[in-house]
Amino acid sequence: MHYKITYPCMPWELDYALLSFTQFKKSRHFDDPKYSWLKGGWYSIKDVEIFDGDIYVSYTKEVKENCWNTSLLSAKMNYVYIHFTTLFTSEECVNEYDNIDDEYNAHQSGGRIINLNNEIVLFSIGDFRSRYQAQSESSIFGKVLKINKKNNDYEVISMGHRNPQGLFYNEDKNFLLEAEHGPQGGDEINVIKLDYNSIQNFGWAISSYGEHYGGKNAPENKNKYEKYPLHKSHSEHGFIEPLKYFNPSIGISQIIGLANENQYVVASLKAHSLYFFEYNYNKKENNFNIVKKLDIGERIRDMIYYNNKLYLYLEDTASLAEISFN
């Protein structure tokens, strides 16, 4: 079934949203042995972007045996046959069994795509739980990259990210809003300036308002906190403070702008909610305000705002929901 909700007012004037939706049946059972090539679920599509006749797909790639990164494909859009070529990849990868931090999670991989213009795409990559790489300028992990479509060259525009899952480009003011999963708490909304002349560093895994899983009192975390202290200040350690952080974690996902200037919405997985907020880029202080939390009742994996409608991709029921603003 398909159900539409039409709001006669702005969303923060409502108390809740009760959604029905279009539901999709699973067509394959990936626990079947014949799908063992999925490597325990580490293979995954992260994002799809279609712009001006081109399609971009990001995914987790096994670069060599048991060693992974997040890569990007592109193709001309064709409804009969699509031939993809590699727009971005790297020989650098994180080995799921043999790495410095002795941890691995390919779901912590970013993969958000923003088409900036005819020459540039922006691309986020998580740290795969290889924390030290987020603070290495020579590594692709824990970064937001600017990639040239013509020659495949790239440069790092920001670093110190854990799992940058959401990106929104404000074309008028030329900045990005980035939504990032924290560890145990500490989900962030960050502002990345695209006219900045140096790499912007957001602090992971030196500073974070979250904690390592299990917290400081867990014996197994002693060495982890020595290497990655998760200071409760970014600016005191030379990093950029988040615009907003969430404790406890909301399981932050995509972030987008709405039709009215300075109005945005960020989605959540764990909290099953939308957070509508106002942000004034031109103000230095008191520039951020959450004006409404709207309960949806499901994990919201992604969303698109188009033609005064908000389309939600709901994970629990593999469904689409549409919210109209009139």
What are these model-predicted stretches?
Residues E285-N307:
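Conserved blade-ending motifs and adjacent loop-strand segments that build the rim/top face
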Residues Y3-I45, D127-N289:
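Beta-propeller domain segments
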Residues K39-K46, N66-N115:
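Asp-box/WD-like beta-propeller blade repeats and closely related beta-sheet repeat scaffolds
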Residues I50-G53, N115-N118, N170-K173, G257-N262, ...:
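Residue-level detector of Asp-centered blade-edge/turn motifs that repeat once per structural unit
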Residues D302-N326:
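Blade-level signature of beta-propeller repeat domains, shared across WD40, Kelch, NHL, RCC1
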Residues D54-S58, I120-S124, F175-A179, Q263-A267, ...:
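Conserved beta-propeller blade signature
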